A protein has these predicted regions:
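Membrane-interface starts of transmembrane alpha-helices
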Residues: 15, 102-109, 113, 135-143, ...
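Membrane-interface coil-to-helix junctions
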Residues: 24-125, 145-166, 205
Length: 231
C-alpha cells in the first residue's frame, strides 16, 4: 500500500501541486489587485464576514488558547450552545489554524483560510478528474482550476464556511463512483462524515444532490447497473 502511494505521488505530484497552487495564487493576485493582502487596510471581510464570522473565529481562537469554554459562551445575547455555533460556522478542518493568529489579525487569518480552501477545492477536483476523465494530464489541472475559481466560489468567498463544501463535493462524487463501480463505500462514508461535521447546511444539499446523481448515473447506464440494484 505504501509503495503504491509513493508511486502515485511520484507520478502525479506536479499536477497535484499545480491544481492547488494555481487557483491559490490566482485568487491571491486578484485580491492584491484590489488592495487586499496581509496587514493591508482592506480585507476579505464583507457583509456577514465583517459583523459575524471574524468574531466567531476570534472566539474559536480563544477556545484553542483556553480562554473560553468549548461548550457554552456568554458572548452572544444571553448566551448560546457553542457546539451548535461550531456545527455551522467553525467546523472546517482548516479552522484550527486561527490558533497561530492574534485576534487583532483575524482578517489575515480569514484571508489565508479562504486561499487554502480555494486551493484545496482545486486539488480535490483533480482527484475526481483523474479518475473520471480520460484526457491529457494537464487538462485535469485545467478543469481543477476552473472548478476552484467558479463564479459561485469567487462571488461567495466571504462566506468562508461554505467553501469547505466544495472541497468535499468532488470526493463525494468520486465516492459514489467507487461505490457503484467497485462496491467500495469507504471514500463516500469518510467524505460524507467530514462534510456534515464541517457544515451540515451544505451537507444536506449535497446529500440531496448525491441521491439524484446516483439515479441519474444509474439510468444513463442501465444495462451496467440494473443487476446490482436487483441484487
Amino acid at each position: 500500500m505504501k509503495n503504491k502511494s509513493r508511486q502515485f505521488l511520484k507520478n502525479n505530484w506536479p499536477y497535484m501541486l499545480a491544481s492547488f497552487f494555481i487557483p491559490f495564487l490566482i485568487m491571491a493576485i486578484i485580491y492584491l489587485s484590489i488592495g487586499i493582502y496581509p496587514r493591508s487596510s482592506r480585507s476579505v471581510l464583507a457583509s456577514d464576514a465583517f459583523s459575524q464570522f471574524s468574531n466567531f473565529h476570534a472566539s474559536f481562537n480563544n477556545v484553542l488558547h483556553g480562554k473560553q469554554s468549548l461548550f457554552y459562551t456568554w458572548n452572544a445575547s444571553l448566551g448560546l450552545n457553542y457546539l451548535s455555533l461550531i456545527s455551522y460556522y467553525l467546523g472546517g478542518l482548516f479552522t484550527p489554524l486561527v490558533f497561530f493568529f492574534n485576534n487583532q489579525n483575524m482578517p489575515d487569518a480569514l484571508y489565508f483560510l479562504t486561499l487554502l480552501k480555494i486551493g484545496s477545492a482545486g486539488l480535490s477536483f483533480w482527484f475526481l478528474a483523474k479518475q473520471t476523465f480520460k484526457i491529457p494530464k494537464w487538462s485535469h489541472v485545467t478543469l481543477s482550476v476552473s472548478y476552484a475559481l467558479m463564479s459561485f466560489i469567487v462571488a461567495h468567498s466571504e462566506l468562508i464556511m461554505w467553501l469547505d463544501a466544495f472541497i468535499y463535493l468532488p470526493l463525494v462524487i468520486l465516492g459514489i463512483h467507487r461505490l457503484m463501480d467497485q462496491r467500495k463505500p469507504t471514500l463516500l462514508f469518510v467524505s460524507y462524515f467530514l462534510l456534515f461535521i464541517t457544515n451540515y447546511y451544505f451537507g444536506f444539499m449535497i446529500g440531496l444532490f448525491s441521491f439524484l446523481y446516483y439515479f441519474a448515473r444509474t439510468f444513463t447506464d442501465w444495462q451496467r447497473y440494473k443487476s446490482r440494484i436487483v441484487a
